[in-house]
C-alpha cells in the first residue's frame, strides 16, 4: 500500500507529559529509563505493586503491556507472560481499573503497549477516553501500519495521548523520515530485526540508526528490543540515544521469582539499570 502523503498527522500545539519528561531529562543529561512489564503477570494486584516499585527505583516512564492471545511482535518470554496474564483473568477493562486505582500514586508517564484488535473490540474512542481519564500518556500499537495510523492518530491525540510509532533497522529511509517526524512523544527504535527478547550483544549499526534519526527528526529516540544488561544500557547511552526500553529482562525476572519476592527483585534490577543509565 502506498503512503497517503496528502494525509497529515495532527500537530500537537502543547507539550505532552512524555515530551516534558524527555525535556526534563535532557536538561540533566540523563537517559530515560523505561521498563516494560505485562499487566496481570502474575496477577493484577502484584502488577500494582511492581508499578509503584519501578517508579520508586528510578524508572522515568513505564510501558505496560495489555495481554493478547496472538502477540506477533513478541518473543517467547513476553508471549508466556501474556499467556499467564490471560490465565489470571486479566482484561483490558481490568488494566484500566488498575490504573484508575493508582492515578494519585503514579506520577511518571504510563505508556500502554497493545495490539490493535483489543482496542478495536473495545472501541477506539471509548478506549482513549477511559485511558485518558486514568492518566495514560502514550500508546504503542505494534501491528498498526503507518497508513492506518494516519486515520486513528487524530482521535488518539484529541485525548492528549501520544501515539508512538516504531522504526526498525529494515525501515526504508524515506519511510523512516515520515515515521520519525510524525510520531508523538518519541521514536521507538527497534534495535534488531525479529521479535522481542534478550540478546547477548548490541549490534553496532544501532549507533548509526540513532544518529540518522536524530538528524532527520527533532523527536527523542528510545531504543528497545534485545536490551537486557547494564552493559547494553550503557552502550545505548554512549551512542547518544534519549531513552532505553527494557522488556524481556524485567518480564523474565517476574516469571522466575516467587510471588513474595517478585516486587523486591524487580526493584533491585531497576536500580541496576538506573545506575547503568546514569553512568
Swiss-Prot record:
Active site positions: 63 (proton acceptor), 74 (proton acceptor)
Gene3D superfamilies assigned to the protein according to its UniProt record, in alphabetical order: Aldolase class I
Alphabetically ordered keywords of this record: Amino-acid biosynthesis, Aromatic amino acid biosynthesis, Lyase, Tryptophan biosynthesis
GO molecular function terms noted in the UniProt entry: tryptophan synthase activity
GO terms for cellular component: cytosol
Pfam families: Trp_syntA
Alphabetical list of InterPro entries matching this protein: Aldolase_TIM (IPR013785), RibuloseP-bd_barrel (IPR011060), Trp_synthase_alpha_AS (IPR018204), Trp_synthase_suA (IPR002028)
Catalytic activity: (1S,2R)-1-C-(indol-3-yl)glycerol 3-phosphate + L-serine = D-glyceraldehyde 3-phosphate + L-tryptophan + H2O
Domain of life: Bacteria
Family label: Belongs to the TrpA family.
Function: The alpha subunit is responsible for the aldol cleavage of indoleglycerol phosphate to indole and glyceraldehyde 3-phosphate.
Protein name as annotated: Tryptophan synthase alpha chain
Amino acid at each position: 500500500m502506498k503512503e497517503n502523503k496528502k494525509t497529515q498527522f495532527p500537530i500537537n500545539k502543547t507539550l505532552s507529559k512524555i515530551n516534558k519528561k524527555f525535556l526534563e531529562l535532557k536538561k540533566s543529561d540523563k537517559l530515560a529509563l523505561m521498563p516494560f512489564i505485562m499487566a496481570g503477570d502474575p496477577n493484577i494486584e502484584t502488577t500494582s505493586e511492581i508499578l509503584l516499585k519501578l517508579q520508586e527505583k528510578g524508572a522515568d516512564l513505564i510501558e505496560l503491556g495489555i495481554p493478547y492471545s496472538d502477540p506477533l511482535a513478541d518473543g517467547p518470554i513476553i508471549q508466556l507472560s501474556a499467556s499467564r496474564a490471560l490465565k489470571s483473568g486479566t482484561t483490558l477493562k481490568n488494566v484500566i481499573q488498575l490504573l484508575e486505582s493508582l492515578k494519585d500514586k503514579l506520577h511518571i508517564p504510563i505508556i500502554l503497549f497493545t495490539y490493535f484488535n483489543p482496542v478495536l473490540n473495545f472501541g477506539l474512542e471509548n478506549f482513549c477516553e477511559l485511558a485518558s481519564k486514568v492518566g495514560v500518556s502514550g500508546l504503542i500499537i505494534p501491528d498498526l501500519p503507518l497508513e492506518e495510523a494516519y486515520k486513528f492518530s487524530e482521535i488518539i491525540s484529541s485525548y492528549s495521548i501520544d501515539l508512538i510509532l516504531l522504526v526498525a533497522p529494515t525501515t526504508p529511509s524515506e519511510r523512516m523520515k515520515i515515521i520519525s517526524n510524525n510520531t508523538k512523544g518519541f521514536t521507538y527504535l527497534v534495535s534488531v530485526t525479529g521479535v522481542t527478547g534478550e540478546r547477548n550483544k548490541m549490534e553496532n549499526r544501532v549507533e548509526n540508526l540513532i544518529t540518522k534519526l536524530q538528524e532527520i527528526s527533532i523527536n527523542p529516540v528510545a531504543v528497545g528490543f534485545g536490551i537486557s544488561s547494564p552493559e547494553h544500557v550503557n552502550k545505548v547511552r554512549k551512542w547518544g540515544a534519549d531513552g532505553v526500553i527494557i522488556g524481556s529482562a524485567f518480564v523474565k525476572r517476574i516469571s522466575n521469582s516467587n510471588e513474595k519476592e517478585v516486587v523486591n527483585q524487580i526493584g533491585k534490577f531497576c536500580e541496576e539499570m538506573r545506575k547503568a543509565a546514569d553512568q
